[in-house]
A protein has these predicted regions:
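Charged, flexible cofactor/metal-binding loops and thiol motifs
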Residues: 41-150
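Long, low-complexity, intrinsically disordered segments
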Residues: 150-156
Length: 156
């Protein structure tokens, strides 16, 4: 309300995208100091295109029973040094979609749709309308959770 009334702009930095979703109109996702995806909050959550964004979104905890058994992306590989970042795409050492080109050529930040920018050699759609992943994820681990059993009236 204050932002709209006073025409304010602010920069909010967080690793918690579940909070960022409700505070920000536009989200920029950064990895190792580089912008890898920039779009409206709605677009980031409905149609993420960078593998790091997809991984971040998969890590958001949920209490929705329909999402409790949803696969989570477990990033593997070496975490690069920000002082001596790798050649090519900075995310390639942990990316589940990386190829040889990613190791050599830094991807440019390109506008794939109006207002949606991505720095990835593979900007094809990553998630369908139901939130299912549209690519093979060999580095995935299925996590399951169970709803807590509530005490019955007799146990209260």
């Amino acid at each position: 309300e204050l932002k709209e009334k006073e025409h304010l702009t602010y920069l909010f930095i967080s690793h918690d995208l579940s909070v960022v979703r409700y505070i920000s109109d536009r989200i920029g996702v950064m990895y190792l100091g580089n912008l890898v995806e920039l779009a409206s909050s709605e677009t980031i959550f409905k149609d993420p295109r960078h593998p790091y964004t997809v991984a971040l979104l998969s890590s958001i905890p949920t209490t929705d029973p329909d999402d409790l058994n949803k696969e989570r992306i477990i990033l593997e590989g070496n975490i690069p040094s920000p002082i001596r970042p790798p050649e090519g795409c900075k995310f390639h050492t942990r990316c589940f979609m990386a190829c040889d080109k990613c190791k050599r050529v830094p991807p440019p930040l390109v506008e794939i749709e109006p207002g949606h920018f991505v720095a990835c050699h593979f900007t094809d759609r990553k998630i369908d309308e139901e939130g299912n992943y549209l690519f093979d994820m060999p580095k995935m681990e299925k996590k399951s959770s169970k709803l807590a059993d509530l005490p019955s009236e007799e146990e209260k």
